Amino acid sequence: MRYMLLIHQGDTPTPGSEAWDRLSEDEQRAVYAAYGSINQTAGVTPGVRMEPPELATTVRVEDGRTLTTDGPFVAVKEALGGYLFLEADDLDAAIELASRIPAARMGGGIEIRPIVGS
């Protein structure tokens, strides 16, 4: 079964943020190592880390006109910060991997979505 794991940042410290700067160098290295390990896990297709939602542009088409708005589509506390794809035997395996993602234990959450037709 294929899953998409959506990494919602919440209060997770991310590189470049004040919260990240408050982490010790050992804590920062541990976060990078955890993501590196996850990306090397069999069945994982790594995604990418995204810029903060304030840098988003939302596009809508109304009456044939393209409208753009600076910022995310909706204001949410746990903005989408990244994603990855996983080929796993079952949901339990996806949950196990999600529990290893640093954001899950540092103030964020991981949403697991099955891929249609997988």
Predicted regions mapped to residue ranges:
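Conserved, structured core segments of small domains
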Residues: M1-S118
